[in-house]
Amino acid sequence: MGIFSFFSKEKKETLDKGLSKTKENVFTKITRAIAGKSKVDDAVLDNLEEVLITSDVGVETTLKIIDRIEKRVERDKYVTTSELTGILRDEIANLLTENKTEDGDGFTLPEDKKTYVIMVVGVNGVGKTTTIGKLAYQFKKAGKKVYLGAADTFRAAAVEQLVIWSERVGVPIVKQKMGSDPASVAFDALSSAKANDADVVIIDTAGRLHNKINLMNELTKIKNVMKKVIPDAPHEILLVLDGSTGQNAFEQAKQFTAATEVNALAVTKLDGTAKGGVVIGISDQFKIPVKYIGLGEGIEDLQVFRKREFVNSLFGE
C-alpha cells in the first residue's frame, strides 16, 4: 500500500512548516553554492560539501553523499546544476535507513506481538516524556489499549509529567515512590499490562549520562527484568533525540547505542531549528531507522517518519 494513501494534506502542511527553517537554511546555502555555475564541477562539489557539513548532516555522511554525486557526474559525463537538487534528494533518501512502519496506516503495532513493549531512552530535556505522552495518545486514538510505566524514578518531575500525560490521554500508569528501583517499576508495569491484555506498554527510563557503565548496567537490568514477564521484551528500544541540538544529538546517539540495542529513533523539536539535517546523518551513521519526528508542541505534532516525504519537504516539493 502506497504512503500517499495515508499522508494527508494536513500532515504534509505540518511537515513543511516544521522543516521550514532547515529547508530555508539548506536551500539558501545550496543556491549560493551553485550561483553562476551551469554544470557540476569540483568547485560546486566542494561548496556542496561545506553546505551539508554546516547543515548538521555530519562529516561521514556528507563525504558519502559527495562521493555518490561524483560517481554520477563521472558516469553521466555532464550534470547541470539544475539537476543537482534532484540527484541530491535521491541520494539522501537512499541513505536514510528504512522505517518498516512508514507504509502503514499511521501509528501501528506488530500484530504478532502482544503485549508490545517499548522502552524509551534518552537524556533529560530532549522531550522524552512528551514523546511518550504523544505516542500513547496516537496508539489510543488507533484503538489500542495502552499502559505507561514511570521507570525514571530519579526525577520527581519525570514521574509527575508522565502522570499528567496519562490523565490527559486517559491511559493507566504504573508508578512507585521516588527513588524506587526502575526495574521493579518496569516489572510491575509489564505485569499489569499483560494481566489486562494491553496492546502496548511504554516504559520511561532515566536520562542520566553521567557514566556509560552505570547507564548500560541500569538499562540491562531493566531489560532482564522485563523478560521475566514477557520473554522477548522489550520489542522496541526507542531513543529520543533533540533535533535542535545538532551535533550533540550525534554524541547522545553514540553513547546510548553503545549502552543498549537501540532499534528506533524519535527526533524531536525539528520545528524550531535549522538543524534538521541531523536526521540524515544519525540515521545513516548508526543504521537505525527514524520512526517518529516531533514537529511542534501540539498533541498531534508527532508524526510517523516517512523518508520520501521528509526529503521532498526538505527540497520544497
Q: Language-model segments: which ranges?
A:
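Short hydrophobic/aromatic residue motifs in ordered secondary structure
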Residues: 59-61, 155, 271, 299
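Short acidic/polar alpha-helix capping motifs at helix-coil junctions
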Residues: 11-16, 125, 153, 215-219, ...
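Short beta-alpha junctions and helix-cap segments that line functional grooves
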Residues: 3, 104-106, 135, 251-252, ...
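Switch/coupling subdomain of P-loop NTPase systems
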Residues: 2-4, 9-15, 20
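Non-catalytic, surface-exposed connector residues within folded enzymatic/regulatory domains
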Residues: 42, 63, 78, 82, ...
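Short glycine-rich anion-binding loops that position phosphate/pyrophosphate groups of nucleotides
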Residues: 206-208
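Primarily NTPase-proximal linker/entry elements flanking Walker-type ATP/GTP-binding cores
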Residues: 16, 20-151, 158-178, 186-194, ...
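Conserved catalytic-core segment of NTP-binding enzymes
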Residues: 161, 181-196, 211-316
